[in-house]
């Protein structure tokens, strides 16, 4: 009762093809494929820029030591944002 048989899905597919037509479905498929390809390329580009950023300086490491020489600066880590 909760699952549909293959015949139910074939009837639904036939109705969708009759309503939208094959040309419209082909255009939707190619648009969706282009969007997925663009998303994958974007993720690949984002991963390569993140890798180059992490190799240049590790997160949390201070590269400028002028603050350590200044005795009036207090270095603390905030636990809660008020």
From Swiss-Prot:
InterPro entries: TatA/B/E, TatA/E. Residues 49-67 have a biased composition (Polar residues). Residues 46-82 are annotated as: Disordered. Signal peptide: none annotated. Its main location: membrane. GO terms for molecular function: protein transmembrane transporter activity. The chain crosses the membrane at residues 1-21. GO terms for cellular component: TAT protein transport complex. Keywords: Cell inner membrane, Cell membrane, Membrane, Protein transport, Translocation, Transmembrane, Transmembrane helix, Transport. Residues 72-82 have a biased composition (Basic and acidic residues). It is a single-pass membrane protein. One of its GO terms (biological process) is protein transport by the Tat complex. It is found in: Cell inner membrane. NCBIfam families: PRK02958.1, tatAE. PANTHER family: SEC-INDEPENDENT PROTEIN TRANSLOCASE PROTEIN TATA (PTHR42982:SF1). The Tat system comprises two distinct complexes: a TatABC complex, containing multiple copies of TatA, TatB and TatC subunits, and a separate TatA complex, containing only TatA subunits. Substrates initially bind to the TatABC complex, which probably triggers association of the separate TatA complex to form the active translocon. Belongs to the TatA/E family. Part of the twin-arginine translocation (Tat) system that transports large folded proteins containing a characteristic twin-arginine motif in their signal peptide across membranes. TatA could form the protein-conducting channel of the Tat system. This is Sec-independent protein translocase protein TatA. It comes from Acidovorax ebreus (strain TPSY). The lineage of its organism: Bacteria, Pseudomonadati, Pseudomonadota, Betaproteobacteria, Burkholderiales. The gene is tatA.
């Amino acid at each position: 009762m909760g699952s549909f048989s293959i015949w139910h899905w074939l009837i639904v597919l036939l109705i969708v093809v009759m309503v939208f037509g094959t040309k419209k479905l082909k255009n939707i498929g190619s648009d969706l494929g282009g969007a997925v390809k663009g998303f994958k390329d974007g993720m690949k580009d984002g991963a390569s820029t993140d890798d180059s950023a992490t190799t240049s300086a590790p997160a949390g490491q201070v590269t400028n030591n002028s603050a350590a020489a200044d005795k009036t600066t207090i270095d603390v880590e905030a636990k809660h944002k008020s």
